[in-house]
Each structure stands twice: as C-alpha cells, then as structure tokens.
Amino acid sequence: MSLTLFDHEPQPAVWDFESRAARRGYRTIAGIDEAGRGPLAGPVVAAAVILPFGTDLPGVDDSKKLTPARRDDLFTLIQGTALAIGVGVADHKVIDRINILQATLAAMREAVECLTDPPDYLLVDGISPVPLPVAQQTIKKGDSASISIAAASIIAKVTRDRLMAEYDQLYPGYGFAEHKGYGSASHMAAIAALGPSPIHRTTFRGVREHLGESRCR
C-alpha cells in the first residue's frame, strides 16, 4: 500500500507522521531518504532509519538546512540513538545503466533490506515508493516534516560526503571534497581541463560532452 501527500508544506521535523502510522497499528516505522541525485559524479546514497518512538532529538531536520559540522554531530547522535540504520549505495555505473530515478529506488531498497529490524511501515521522502512489499507513505519534502526521514537524510548526506572526500584523494584536481560532485563553476572548469574522472556520470549533461577527453586512468 502506498499513499502520497502531494500538497504537504514543510514544517520542523516532528513525530506527526510516525504517530499517525502508530495509531493505525504499525510498530516498526522507518524513515527513508537519499543524497546525491543531482551531482555529476559519485554515487547516490540512501538511508533507512528506525528511531525509538518519541525520542527527543533536538536539531534533527532536513540535512540541507544544516551546516556540515552540525550534520556530523547529529550523525553521531542518530547512530547512538537509532534502533536500526541501513545504508544503500548505487554507484555511477548503476546510475548510467538504469537512470538516476531507478538507481535511487534501488539504493533505497538496499537501505531498507539492510535494516536489522525489518520495518512494517516506511515513510519515504519524495513521490516514488520504494519497490518493496511494505506498507508505505511518500511525502514531498518529507525531510522537513518527519523526524525519521530527517534522520535518514542526515545519515545519507554525511555518508555520501565522506565517500566524496575519499574520491577526492583518489582523483585529485576535481575538488570532490569541496563540491561533492555537484556542478559548481570550479567543478565544470575541472571537467573541461581534465576530462571526466572514472566516477563521473557519463549520461549526465555537463559530463557526456567531454567523453574521450579524460586524462585520468
């Protein structure tokens, strides 16, 4: 079963959606979100988080609203508080092969399947349900509305940022640690100068125009 709220307006991340699911009899509720749909390089990372119901987690909100330092602090807090955390990764090759939407859903599915405590209900950021036979609700801008989704957004974002910092060491000159693969001016200039790296998404505009120019092996 999938229910989509198309007209939801953002508000501070709270327990409202989890409470509604609990009143309907669901007991193991996971929030799902991703990071990295838009970049020109690197993977898309999804996270699934099950929190102890009603736990006070001050500051947990949409990861995009938080500073990197605050995200790191909350990442540690969530890791120490959550009942279960699952992470899924779809790399640049998967993205190029099946497209970014399908890669995102595959990463979300992997994140849910990695949970040590199988959920009976999913709260999913966005409008596309996770391809699993689990009751779920998709919520536009859910990372600002559901604390479970907000927690997942932080786990996904910090995990991906750390992966991109590692790639920065493997492929110097592109600035991956700074822009995380997004199409900043400095990133576009690096692609023009160096050609695509081995982790660039070759089907994305801004990269495919430079195929065959790579100086990185």
Swiss-Prot record:
It holds the Pfam family RNase_HII. Its cofactor is Mn(2+); Mg(2+). One of its GO terms (molecular function) is RNA binding. CDD domains: RNase_HII_bacteria_HII_like. Signal peptide: none annotated. It is an enzyme of class 3 (hydrolase). InterPro entries: RNase_HII (IPR022898), RNase_HII/HIII (IPR001352), RNase_HII/HIII_dom (IPR024567), RNaseH-like_sf (IPR012337), RNaseH_sf (IPR036397). This is Ribonuclease HII. It comes from Geobacter sulfurreducens (strain ATCC 51573 / DSM 12127 / PCA).
